[in-house]
Structures are given as C-alpha cells and as structure tokens.
Amino acid sequence: MLGCLIKKIYPNTKIIYINLGRTLLFDFYYSRKCFPQLNHRLIRSNQDCLLADFNYIEAEYLDQVIFASDIFINISSMQEMDYEVISKYFDAFHNQDIGSYFYCCNRVSKTLPDGAEINFSEYGWVANSDQTLIDELCPWHQNFPVNWPPFYKKFDGPHQHRLVRLIK
C-alpha cells in the first residue's frame, strides 16, 4: 500500500484514497492494519471534512467531494477505466486551488473486456497547460512477482509513467 509507505515516511501527511467502493474496503483494511492508532474516515460529501490521517472516497462519489492535494498518484488502475471515468478524475485533479502534481503509471494501451481500447496518451492530459516533468516507459513497473523462478513475469504490455505539474 503506497499510502501507508508515504504515511510512514511523512507522518504528518494526510492520505486520501479514491477507489471503487469494494476495492476501497481493502485499502481501508490494510491501512487500518498498518496504522490502527490513527484516524480513518469515509468521505461521501463536502460535509465530511478531510481531517483524518486516512480519508477514503468512493469513486462513485468523486464528483460530490471537493478536496485539495499536493500530489495525486495512480498506478495500474486507470488502464481499467473507460475514458468517461478517467475524465472525472482529471476534472477533479484540475479543479484544485493549489498547484498539484500527478504521477501516473499505467499500460501504454489496454483492451478492456468490452473491447474498448484505452491508451495512456489519450487519458486527458492538457498539453498546453500541464507541465510534464517525466514521460517515459517506466523502468520499475514492467514485470510483476510470481511464485516460481525467476520470480517475475512481464506484463502483457509496456507501462508508461508520467509526472506532471497540473496548471489550473
């Protein structure tokens, strides 16, 4: 859990998880297991304050919650979404009052079960305003661990990673 690692290194950081409701349960479970003494809170509207150490927003409620973050991180889940859902995330990221950063690491291209092809380059990047700091094939996320030698296997396709400074 990347959020737990960030919290361990930067203890004053507030973590906001945005995920599908069922998957968010696992985020909550493992974060709570790592940090049982800290505050964990489900956020569903603007009436819920993002004051807990760990805040959880169901993706289904993303457009109903206004939040601020210094950095957004997405690893290997936008490749599972259609463009309409990806667009909601990008809208939320770009509606920040502060200059935020977005780190994204996903497959260059993936065909979803319904046959739709999702391409990293078409996610909703704003070339004229966002400042790209890193944009390359990801050197650390081309393989995944398995239980037999050589204990890793290549993903079905290459992963791209990009770090941008979001300009409002």
Predicted feature locations:
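Conserved SAM-binding motif I beta-strand of class I
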Residues: 14-20
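S-adenosyl-L-methionine
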Residues: 30-66
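Conserved acidic residues
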Residues: 69-70, 100
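A short, conserved alpha-helix within the catalytic core of class I
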Residues: 80-93
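Conserved beta-strand signature within the Rossmann-like core of class I S-adenosyl-L-methionine
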Residues: 97-110
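Rossmann-like AdoMet/SAM-dependent catalytic core
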Residues: 122-168
